[in-house]
């Protein structure tokens, strides 16, 4: 699929991002009675804390209300930097091209913040409220 191709009216790259950071079929795990660490928020700090603790053998729960990656991946740092990088020195850049580029960059790095990566690392990921 191409970056501009639509899936149910949504750009393909947005759909790919969603599949990684909030998979529609994902089921929250049955909570353990006790965790060594409960992390609230799957932004950059929460992701590092949870995967590091799990790597050291801790029972870790990661709770995210919105999307894995937090504002940095989904709304803030990554999208704004990608838009700036694309348009810098490109006087012919269009809104459509810039946003297509931003979606491509965001989707290409989302696997680092994916639910599956953290589940595979031993983190109990809880999505929603």
Predicted regions, residues:
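Residues forming the Rossmann-fold NAD(P)(H) cofactor-binding site
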Residues: 47
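Glycine-rich Rossmann-fold phosphate-binding loop(s) that bind the pyrophosphate
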Residues: 41-44, 65-66
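Glycine-rich flavin
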Residues: 1-35, 51-58, 63-129
């Amino acid at each position: 699929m191409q970056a501009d191709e639509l899936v149910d009216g949504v750009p393909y790259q947005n759909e790919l991002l969603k599949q990684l950071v909030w998979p529609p079929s994902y089921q929250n795990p049955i909570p353990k009675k006790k965790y060594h660490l409960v992390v609230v928020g799957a932004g950059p700090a929460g992701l590092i804390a949870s995967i590091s603790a799990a790597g050291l053998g801790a029972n870790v729960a990661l709770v995210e209300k919105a999307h894995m990656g937090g504002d940095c991946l989904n709304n803030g740092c990554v999208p704004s930097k990608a838009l700036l990088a694309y348009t810098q020195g490109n006087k012919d850049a269009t809104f459509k091209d810039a946003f297509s580029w931003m979606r491509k960059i965001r989707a290409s790095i989302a696997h680092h913040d994916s639910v599956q990566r953290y589940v595979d690392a031993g983190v109990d990921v809880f999505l929603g409220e």
